[in-house]
Amino acid sequence: MMQMMEFSFSSPAFFLLLPFLFLLIKPLISRKRGPKLPPGPKKLPIVGNLFHMEGALPHLALKKMTDKYGPICHLKLGELEAVVVSSAELAKEVLNTHAVTFADRPETNVSKIVMYNNSGMTFARYGDYFKLLRQIYASELLSPRCVRSSTNHMEDELSKFVVKIQAEAGKPIFLLERVKSYLFAVLFDSMIGGACKCPERYIEAAKELSANSAAMRLEDFFPSVTLLPKLSGFNTVLAKLKKKIDDLLDDLISEREKIQANATGPMEEHMLDVLLKLRNGSGSETKVPITNEDVKAVVFELMLSNLSTAATEEWAMSEMMRSPKVFKKAQDEVRRVFKGKNRICASELHNLEYLKLVIKEALRMHPPAPLLFPRKAREDCEIGGYTIPVGTMVWVNYWAVGRDPQLWHDADKFEPERFSNVPMDFNGSHSELIPFGAGRRICPGIAYGVTNLELLLSALLYHFDWELPNGKQPEEIDMDEFYGSGCIRKNPLALIPKVVIPCQA
């Protein structure tokens, strides 16, 4: 007669089944005891959600995900844990409420190889070194006092910029490259007190680095696979670019050191002089040493910031050309404020109330970095009711915040008037308008960049009328984007200038 098999803790069958029972129960235990992560798409083995990032515009890909899963979304990108937030409320939690927790940066091959092992304020890990750089920027390089002292240089270079455009009146020109030349000329004035040799070499190097810094690359998502960047050839590309940048910056520094050595009396101090003084240990009580590589990293990240300013100027002109009423209103204001003058002067910029609204609206719709530079959690933290584990990479999709219909009426329309009588600025306290970031890692060059934007747009509106080439209509201007280290126009804006109020340099 058959007997029923009995399972007991001594039964061999129990021990055979035990591993299978553990495999069945483990996910339930993990789900119960593990952290409450934000929702997100299903993860594939090894690659996780990398396939969701396909396409040239990551801010749009991530916007689709948060539209589906909510304003906070968890991703697995290769070996990395990542979270994307796309609401003003959650951006404030990440950048302001938990500013110190999310003050760190993830490391990339670009930041490690080209930017001197994560040197400079943009890529530095959070700590004493970062705090020192922030202090240097705030008090020595880009303080309001430093910006005010630079306005004479800005005005002089602006007049030269206008005269060059006057010489090309009546034919189509691409504004972007001319704006970059102006911005680099102003930077070199502030950096060394005058022009440098072959400034176009620095512009090209900055553009090349920007093109190789498109968000994060596949190699960054698998940091343990050290052969990957070698096999892809990306390390070779970066090494060549690093040498090019190194040679340029070494030339700039050595030339400045020669001038300092040959000076027979007191010299006017410029940005590079301040950095070299800190490198040499003069005038600094900090315990954190400033090396020659730190100096080069700071100088080059200042150059990179010029590309963002130039892109914003082009977006602003594009939007105004698409909106003739906005263009005329801004132009009428500029010509009223500067009436009778033959050049733009910074002392009158505070009177350009409508132009300031135009710039805010341009930065809302076209932020320099649609995905704010990623942060890295320094410890476990709760955001929006979910756990963000230590080491997680966090992106704030400001492009999504700037186009959020719950925050902005008719969010895809260029409407500067939406900021009228609204006390909202770029200092990071208004999470609806944070194109320059917020919290501990807010961009230190806001005043410098915005002043240049106001001067550039004022000059273009004051001295010239503008037409589209080949009879193109305003609504035909394409607004396609290209993503590098920031977001620029895919196709450069071509316009025809007509001189109305001549300028003499």
Curated annotation (Swiss-Prot):
Q: Name one GO biological process term.
A: alkaloid biosynthetic process
The protein's topology relative to the membrane is: Single-pass membrane protein
Q: What is this protein called?
A: Geissoschizine oxidase
Instruction: Give the EC number.
Output: 1.14.19.80
Q: What does this protein do?
A: Monooxygenase involved in the biosynthesis of curare monoterpene indole alkaloids (MIAs), natural products such as strychnine, a neurotoxic compound used as a pesticide to control rodents, and its pharmacologically active derivatives, including brucine, used to regulate blood pressure. Curare alkaloids act as animal glycine receptor antagonists. Catalyzes the conversion of geissoschizine to dehydropreakuammicine by cyclization, which is spontaneously converted into akuammicine by aromatization.
Chain residues that bind heme = 443
What CDD domains has UniProt attached to this entry? CYP71-like (cd11072)
- A Pfam family matched by this chain, by name? p450
Reactions listed under catalytic activity: (19E)-geissoschizine + reduced [NADPH--hemoprotein reductase] + O2 = akuammicine + formate + oxidized [NADPH--hemoprotein reductase] + H2O + H(+); (19E)-geissoschizine + reduced [NADPH--hemoprotein reductase] + O2 = 3,17-didehydrostemmadenine + oxidized [NADPH--hemoprotein reductase] + 2 H2O; 3,17-didehydrostemmadenine = 17-dehydropreakuammicine
Which GO cellular component does the record give, naming just one?
Answer: membrane
The record's family statement is: Belongs to the cytochrome P450 family.
Q: Which GO terms describe its molecular function?
A: heme binding; iron ion binding; monooxygenase activity; oxidoreductase activity, acting on paired donors, with incorporation or reduction of molecular oxygen
Organism in which the protein naturally occurs = Strychnos nux-vomica
Main EC class of this protein? oxidoreductase
State the needed cofactors, names only: heme
InterPro entries in the record, alphabetically? Cyt_P450, Cyt_P450_CS, Cyt_P450_E_grp-I, Cyt_P450_sf
Please spell out the taxonomic lineage of the organism that makes this protein: Eukaryota, Viridiplantae, Streptophyta, Embryophyta, Tracheophyta
Listed A to Z, the keywords are:
Heme, Iron, Membrane, Metal-binding, Monooxygenase, Oxidoreductase, Transmembrane, Transmembrane helix
Q: Where in the cell is it found?
A: Membrane
| Regions annotated as coiled coil | none
User: What's the chief localization of this chain?
Assistant: membrane
Pathway listed: Alkaloid biosynthesis
Q: Transmembrane segments in this chain: where?
A: 9-29
Keyword field contains Membrane: yes
Q: Provide the tissue specificity.
A: Mainly expressed in roots.
Ribonucleoprotein as a keyword? no
